[in-house]
Amino acid sequence: MRSSVRPVDPSQLLKGVLDLAVLAVLDRADGYGYEVLRGLRAAGLEEVGDASVYGTLRRLYHAGLLTSYVVPSEEGPHRKYYSLNARGRDRLAESTKTWHAFAGTMERLVGA
């Protein structure tokens, strides 16, 4: 009999924490979509896709967690920068607490 249980898929884990990861990158500095993507990949999230990041930025913006502004670019089209606003910083703080509690629980379950 073949088992239907598969190893943990990192892309599935990423879906659950992409909002937190994007907010954390923007907490360090304002950024446009590609900069946020580079920040995530530099932190070790190489699997994250462009469309996922751009979609997350739009969703967080429409949820009122980010502000945006446009900066002219000499290398092509203008760039839309995103920054955390007060609601975004509050969400980042709440999500960080939740993440630490969850990660601690998982660490106790699976061990170090």
What are these regions (language model features)?
Residues 54-61:
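Short, hydrophobic-biased segments on the C-terminal half of alpha helices
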Residues 10-54:
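N-terminal helix-turn-helix DNA-binding core of bacterial DNA-binding proteins
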Residues 63-75, 83:
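Beta-hairpin "wing" of winged helix-turn-helix
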Residues 8-12, 70-71:
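Short beta-strand/turn micro-motifs at beta-sheet edges
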Residues 2-6, 89-112:
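Amphipathic alpha-helical dimerization/coiled-coil segments
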